[in-house]
Amino acid sequence: MKRYFTVQKKLLSENMNPINFKETQEFKKDFKKLLKKFRSLEEDLEMAKLATIEPYHVGIKNKYGILEKKDASAIFLIPNFCTEELKICKLKKFACRALKGRGVKSGIRITYAFYIKTNSVDFIEIYFKGEKEIEDKERIKEYLTSVL
């Protein structure tokens, strides 16, 4: 499985303009907590960055070298938080190998901010839907006030 991940990562990264990924302190705490339950989470997050987030926001070069954006049904904009320069998104379809047999319906959700001009992503929150139903809107508001 490790070899497959390395090959996929190489193929995907060759086709894209890289996005700069950062994590908030709260995200790091949430991630560390979930990592104890779901051991494959670190590799799964890397794969989600390459296979879902980057193709959705930046695109992938097709066989003719033309950049095409991926229509991802996995990513949703969170209403009332988006501006022209900043999009607050939620990644719903997150495949976690530690949750065998569930595929993209793992129940893990990631909330992040995408900066259009700088091509960067700040991860705000990660949670398991079995423990928490929806994203923390207060945390998003706090994040927005701290960066704007």
Regions found by a protein language model. Name each.
Residues 23, 41, 87, 104-107:
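Amphipathic alpha-helical interface surfaces
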Residues 55-100:
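A short, surface-exposed loop/turn module that caps and links secondary-structure elements
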Residues 48-55, 62, 66, 109-112, ...:
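Short, surface-exposed, charged/polar-biased interaction segments
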Residues 1-63:
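Arg/Lys-rich, positively charged N-terminal/basic patches that mediate binding to nucleic acids
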Residues 30, 44, 74-78, 136:
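Acidic side chains
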Residues 4-17, 93-148:
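Enriched for short, Lys/Arg-rich terminal
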Residues 1-5, 58, 69-75, 105-109:
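Short amphipathic alpha-helical surface micro-motifs
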